Amino acid sequence: LSTSLRTRQTWEGLSFSWGKKKPKVEFQRALYLAAWPALLAVVKTAPEKTQSLMLIGHNPGIEQLAFALALKPKTPPERTRLEAMAAKYPTAALAVLDFDGAWKDAAAGAFQLTEFIKPKDIPGYDGEDD
């Protein structure tokens, strides 16, 4: 997670769903306003035993990373999700990407975009997209 106040607040808003079994969290100053290649470098350093990885960062870097990783959609639904990301990637959007390789081999176009969720897609959300 970026060390910024906003990303910490985002994490606090999400972390309750894990209850007492919260995942390990690392705050990294390097994620603050990082460009997508720097974010990809962080992904590549994840330990191999890591099954899931969540980055909470800032636009434009986090948005550009999602685009770079999902660059080659393989199915019509994935293409539709990529088009939705291209139309608008608002603050607090979530891109879920699947990757079958070793983290150290993570590369642009190697991931599948399995979900793209904007805040307004969540039932009960009454705010505005940034």
Show the residue positions of the predicted features.
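Alpha-helix N-cap/helix-start capping motif
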Residues: S4-R8, N59-P60, T91
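Short, well-ordered, mixed-charge alpha-helical segments that flank or form enzyme active sites
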Residues: E63-Q64, D105-A106, I122-P123
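Domain-level recognition of soluble alpha/beta enzyme cores
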Residues: A70-Q112, F116-P119
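A glycine-rich beta-strand to alpha-helix segment
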Residues: T50-K72
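Extended, histidine- and acidic-residue-enriched regions that form the cofactor-binding/catalytic faces
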Residues: D121-D130
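Residues that form or immediately flank small-molecule/cofactor binding pockets and catalytic motifs
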Residues: A30-Y32, K118-D121
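Phosphate-coordination/substrate-recognition cap region in phosphate-metabolizing enzymes
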Residues: L1-S52
